[in-house]
Amino acid sequence: MMNRSAEVQRDTLETRVKVRLDLDGTGESRIRIGVPFMEHMLDQVARHGLIDLDIEADGDTHIDDHHTVEDVGITLGQALAQALGDKKGIRRYGHAYVPLDEALSRVVVDFSGRPGLQFHVDFVRARIGQFDVDLFQEFFQGLVNHAALTLHVDNLRGINAHHQAETVFKALGRALRMAAEADPRQADRIPSTKGAL
């Protein structure tokens, strides 16, 4: 299988985001986006997905975190799409259930080529520290649109918002890892009866 790494930079009037990733890494991460709780969540994706992830962002966080969080999702999605290439030889589908104490979340991924998000997380409070939980949906929508993947995110239970979020992001990492894994039985085939994803 080819080298599955990518580097993408996105510059707008609101943000500057640079993402470097390696899908076949060991889970090393350097996340510097100026939004501490989101940095913590992205670190979970790297560690549990065994994705080497380096993200740097400079955004208009003096207004709020919206543009930075959304644009990190967009740029990460672009990097995922670039690293996967034509998707030959991957498993395509991935899923994970992850618990953390009382919280349990399920994430299901399909590198389908069709952006689709089902996000069902009823956070028990509106903020985790200073972080607005509404921004998670913006992140996932940007990721899905630009990675061209179908993503189902469900928090099944939880009474602690931090635990709810952390189980979602750990499960995302594990589901991405499973879906992007090389399948030796498919070798150089695209995992679709259409012959393209």
From Swiss-Prot:
Cross-referenced InterPro entries: IGPD_sf, ImidazoleglycerolP_deHydtase, ImidazoleglycerP_deHydtase_CS, Ribosomal_Su5_D2-typ_SF
Gene Ontology biological process terms from the UniProt entry: L-histidine biosynthetic process
EC number of this enzyme: 4.2.1.19
PROSITE patterns: IGP_DEHYDRATASE_1 (PS00954), IGP_DEHYDRATASE_2 (PS00955)
Top-level taxon in the UniProt lineage: Bacteria
Annotated GO CC locations: cytoplasm
Protein name, UniProt field: Imidazoleglycerol-phosphate dehydratase
Catalytic activity: D-erythro-1-(imidazol-4-yl)glycerol 3-phosphate = 3-(imidazol-4-yl)-2-oxopropyl phosphate + H2O
HAMAP family documented for this protein: HisB (MF_00076)
Pathway annotation from the record: Amino-acid biosynthesis; L-histidine biosynthesis; L-histidine from 5-phospho-alpha-D-ribose 1-diphosphate: step 6/9
Keyword Manganese: no
Gene source species: Alkalilimnicola ehrlichii (strain ATCC BAA-1101 / DSM 17681 / MLHE-1)
An example Gene Ontology molecular-function term: imidazoleglycerol-phosphate dehydratase activity
Localization (cell): Cytoplasm
Family: Belongs to the imidazoleglycerol-phosphate dehydratase family.
